[in-house]
A protein has these predicted regions:
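Donor/substrate-binding cores of folate-linked one-carbon enzymes
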Residues: 84, 88-197
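Glycine-rich phosphate-binding loop signature in dinucleotide/nucleotide-binding domains
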Residues: 76-83
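Short, well-ordered alpha-helical microsegments
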Residues: 15, 44, 93-96
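Short, surface-exposed acidic-centric catalytic microdomains
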Residues: 28-68
Length: 204
């Protein structure tokens, strides 16, 4: 079971890419069980409603300790028997207790070929602006596990995308989404979910 966690235009399409891939039979090892948004106005909730996926909002209260928020999130994940978490623009930083509890079971996608253009400050259009400024000829996307270091977890999969003459951050962002992110994320989810299912079968 896999919860998707929520934001932004690109993130909306990432979630839809997962939903579409599941409908097409491309993610047989995972059930899309829950969408958790940190913002009640997140369009992820509408997407989930339209797809018949359970969804909820879990806000971090003002002044709430990260560990306490993490315990509330963990309780929600355990209540829904969640095995794998896919981050898609979830606005609240994941507390360390959640990362520890779901070690190598939280997936994130980053719009560059890590280790290039990643880490603190590299998000959204900033990534593509940096790639164009550096003059790279190839960029892409990376799906990786989440750990305590921003974009620092083990790499699951990468896909390269050509940078074209005349590209702007916006055109490059769109190409990376269409040619890499929307393809790579469902594939990585199936890979990880399949490995979890296989290990579970071997224990039986």
């Amino acid at each position: 079971r896999d919860p998707e966690m929520s934001r932004g235009l690109g993130d909306v399409y990432k979630r839809q890419a997962i939903i579409d891939a599941k409908r097409a039979g491309e993610i047989p090892s995972a059930e899309l069980a829950l969408v958790v948004a940190s913002n009640a106005s997140a369009y992820a909730l509408t997407r989930a409603e339209n797809a018949g996926i359970a969804h909820t909002v879990l806000r971090k209260e003002k002044g709430e300790a990260p560990e306490n928020y993490g315990e509330r999130l963990l309780a929600l994940l355990r209540e829904n028997a969640i095995d794998v978490v896919v981050l898609a623009g979830f606005l609240t930083i994941l507390p360390e207790n959640v990362i520890r509890a779901y070690d190598h079971r939280i997936l994130n996608i980053h719009p560059s070929l890590i280790p290039s253009f990643c880490g603190d400050g590299f998000y959204g259009l900033h990534v593509h602006e940096a790639a164009l400024k550096r003059g790279v000829k190839v960029t892409g996307a990376t799906v990786h596990f989440v750990n305590e270091i921003t974009d620092g977890g083990d790499i699951i999969a990468q896909k390269a995308v050509e940078v074209l003459p005349g590209d702007t951050p916006e055109t490059l962002q769109r190409r990376v989404m269409e040619q890499a992110e929307w393809i790579l994320l469902p594939q990585a989810l199936e890979q990880v979910a399949g490995e979890i299912a296989k290990k579970r079968e071997e224990k039986q």
